[in-house]
């Protein structure tokens, strides 16, 4: 029956990526469905359009898990802090890179060994590129910035730099 089926009130998007997820989410929102997604790729690239459709249709779009999953940040940015003059967003938003940098700092591990340990413990994905090159953090920052500053911020507008070239000497100087 499709996403417009009157018996379906919620749509949970689990596909990832931007295509065809964007089409399905827009279709569900247009039909007035509540949509739940953790798709930071989609929100970082097409958040304005998706959130705009949710507003236009008075549909509920939930995406708290897309940014700092264990820390509720989206709702406070939208509601509790809406009247504040936010000037910057600072935070640790990627657990994999946080773990790697902590191991390099506290245990003196080199990057390669710290990444291997993170992978062994299940903190790093099989392909950790999005984490260690800063793409994951950049997408999260684009989403949070769009909300906090009430302005369209895309992933491409967020400066990202990975941690793959950080050495023990860099850590020493950072201390």
Cite the ranges covered by each PLM segment.
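Short, small-residue-biased leader/transition segments that mark boundaries at the very start
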Residues: 2-7
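N-terminal Rossmann-like NAD(P) cofactor-binding module of classical short-chain dehydrogenase/reductase
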Residues: 11-12
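Short glycine-/small-residue-rich Rossmann-like dinucleotide-binding loops
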Residues: 15-16
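Rossmann-fold NAD(P)-binding glycine/threonine-rich loop
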Residues: 20-22, 26-27, 40-78
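Conserved active-site and cofactor/substrate-binding residues in soluble primary-metabolism enzymes
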Residues: 45, 68, 72, 84, ...
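Oxidoreductase and adenylate-handling cofactor-binding alpha/beta cores
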Residues: 73-86, 97-112, 139-153
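Substrate-binding/catalytic subdomain of NAD(P)-dependent oxidoreductase enzymes
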Residues: 113-175
């Amino acid at each position: 029956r499709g996403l417009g089926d009157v018996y379906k009130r919620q749509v949970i998007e689990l596909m990832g990526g931007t295509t065809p997820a964007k089409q399905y989410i827009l279709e569900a929102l247009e039909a007035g469905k509540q949509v739940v997604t953790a798709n930071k790729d989609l929100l970082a690239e097409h958040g304005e359009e998706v959130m705009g459709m949710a507003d236009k249709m008075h549909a509920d779009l939930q995406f708290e898990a897309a940014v700092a999953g264990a820390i509720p940040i989206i709702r406070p940015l939208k509601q509790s802090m809406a009247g504040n003059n936010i000037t910057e967003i600072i935070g640790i938003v990627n657990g994999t890179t946080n773990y790697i940098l902590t191991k390099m700092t506290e245990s003196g591990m080199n990057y390669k060994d710290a990444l291997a340990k993170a992978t062994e413990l299940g903190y790093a994905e099989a392909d950790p590129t999005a984490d260690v090159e800063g793409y994951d953090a950049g997408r999260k920052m684009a989403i949070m910035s769009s909300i906090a500053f009430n302005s369209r911020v895309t992933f491409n507008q967020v400066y990202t730099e990975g941690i793959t070239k950080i050495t023990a000497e860099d850590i020493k100087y950072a201390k």
